[in-house]
């Protein structure tokens, strides 16, 4: 295993939202449209494309390996079933000097969640650090609440402790890193606009 930041050199290109976002020296995230752009794939030397969706069709290009992860972007979807096998596959591609593109429809939820699982397992990052790094490379990432619960469970499975937790909010359960922004979204005039975390109550 490598150290947490060894695969994340400062000379990486600036984060890209419409194109491919480089997460490590061998891992990229994108949306479905970018994943089917031959020029983007070749210019970034992608050798493996992992499609984490049921709605995006693959354009099969020669000399690229395709892996399908048929999961919908819904909190009840069991994306965690793929945490280990996909992390292992990304690592295997890197060991062969290849590069992996991980994508879903928007490059926001499903592919981001699998990226976080990979960083935890193979770069020994905490979930908090993995999220901070990935978000710095692709600012639009936002796994759904169900995927967050699965990632938190996976972090505990790997390390025996958690750096994040799910908390109650007027919008339902959310990871605690979203607590501040969710509190700011609640109208001041709403009587029930109090944000609860355990027994604590923060008034707006």
Swiss-Prot record:
Under Gene Ontology molecular function, one entry of this record is: protein tyrosine/serine/threonine phosphatase activity
EC top class, as a word? hydrolase
Q: So where's the catalytic machinery, residue-wise? A: 104 (phosphocysteine intermediate)
Q: Where is this region: Sufficient for mitochondrial localization?
A: 95-141
Listed A to Z, the keywords are: Cytoplasm, Hydrolase, Membrane, Mitochondrion, Mitochondrion inner membrane, Nucleus, Protein phosphatase
What reaction does this enzyme carry out catalytically? Answer: O-phospho-L-tyrosyl-[protein] + H2O = L-tyrosyl-[protein] + phosphate; O-phospho-L-seryl-[protein] + H2O = L-seryl-[protein] + phosphate; O-phospho-L-threonyl-[protein] + H2O = L-threonyl-[protein] + phosphate
InterPro entries per record: Atypical_DUSP_subfamB, Dual-sp_phosphatase_cat-dom, Prot-tyrosine_phosphatase-like, Tyr_Pase_AS, Tyr_Pase_dom, TYR_PHOSPHATASE_DUAL_dom
Q: Name one GO biological process term.
A: peptidyl-threonine dephosphorylation
Q: What EC number(s) does its UniProt record assign?
A: 3.1.3.16, 3.1.3.48
Q: What does this protein do?
A: Can dephosphorylate single and diphosphorylated synthetic MAPK peptides, with preference for the phosphotyrosine and diphosphorylated forms over phosphothreonine. In vitro, dephosphorylates p-nitrophenyl phosphate (pNPP).
Protein name, entry field: Dual specificity protein phosphatase 18
